[in-house]
Amino acid sequence: MRIDHIRQRLRASGAKPCHEQRVLRAWTHALPLDRGRCRSEDFFPAPLGARLPALGAELAALAQVRSEHAGEDGARLLVELADGQTVESVLLPRDGLCVSTQVGCAVGCAFCMTGRDGLLRQLGSAEIVAQVVLARSRRAVRKVVFMGMGEPAHNLDNVLEAIALLGTEGGIGHKNLVFSTVGDRRVFERLPQGSVKPALALSLHTTRPALRTKLMPRAPRLDPAELVELGETYARATGYPIQYQWTLLAGVNDDDEELDGIVRLLAGKYAVMNFIPYNSVAGAGFARPSWEHAAAMARYLHRRGILTKLRHSAGQDVDGGCGQLRARVIASGALGQPAEAAPDRVVLVRRGQA
């Protein structure tokens, strides 16, 4: 389901812009339409009010929590969609949330579990927002990063539609919506045109073109230097620094040559380098460098004027890196079993109809 389809249904039921905004605001904030002294039957046209319970049930069925896996750095949710497919969302520290944009992924990064089975299907914009609604039914969400399963650039229309809603009725600051991509020229064309301009995270991982092709075999053929220049143009236009993502792989992209390459590419740029130690994937053939080595790399870049953050990869303590939780559940055969009870379903109802 797409958000535009929801808007069309509301309008077909007699909704004016103020009614449409009220419904979408309540949904994106995981709130009932009846709050305090505000009664929906006093606000909505009768035909619209009569159709809201059915619409609310459809929205609630878009995404449900199949299982939750607590960890030191946040909880990972296995989210079941209406057709039985599953994706992962991660409740991050400081009211952050990581959402998925596809079931599977076509990029096939060598160090990632998600792309092993290829792309299964796109998520509709409403399914993307539904992950935020699920999270908000559990706790506050003030930042959303599009860094879960899938490549957002390969589902651009749906992702941008979700961003537009979250940055308006959803009440999330534009710089707290982070679009992550391996690099696609369409992203740099489309993002500046939107009314909501998100922050941008670029998957760099290496400064060496040949190694980048090996690590991300089906990513667009963008030279790292060109990718950085495209990012810099967007950063200067929006006023948000580009976040460069770098998965640290021991003996692969953690040597002095790479450090010098980072300095060469990012010196003077409006950028933040995020070092993320590799989250082990069985059979991938990579290893995580020691924390001490990773910290030394970050210190070196700091001394050279590159703002660098060393981040924990969410889910390391529960073997729940991107795609791993879903793969483990599929391997166990648990997807054929009923989902856990979901008390956090959000349904748009009028008072007295629940």
Swiss-Prot record:
GO terms for cellular component: cytoplasm. Its cofactor is [4Fe-4S] cluster. Residues 91-317 form the Radical SAM core domain. Disulfide bonds join 98-322. Keywords: 4Fe-4S, Cytoplasm, Disulfide bond, Iron, Iron-sulfur, Metal-binding, Methyltransferase, S-adenosyl-L-methionine, Transferase. One of its GO terms (molecular function) is 4 iron, 4 sulfur cluster binding. Binds 1 [4Fe-4S] cluster. The cluster is coordinated with 3 cysteines and an exchangeable S-adenosyl-L-methionine. It is found in: Cytoplasm. Its EC number is 2.1.1.-. InterPro entries: Aldolase_TIM (IPR013785), Methyltransferase_A (IPR040072), rRNA_lsu_MTrfase_RlmN/Cfr (IPR004383), rSAM (IPR007197). GO terms for biological process: rRNA base methylation; tRNA methylation. S-adenosyl-L-methionine binds at residues 150-151, 180, 203-205, 279. Coiled coil: none annotated. It is an enzyme of class 2 (transferase). It comes from the Bacteria. [4Fe-4S] cluster binds at residues 105, 109, 112. The active site is at residues 88, 322. Its main location: cytoplasm. Belongs to the radical SAM superfamily. RlmN family. PANTHER family: 23S RRNA METHYLTRANSFERASE, RADICAL SAM CORE DOMAIN-CONTAINING PROTEIN. This is Probable RNA methyltransferase AZOSEA28700.
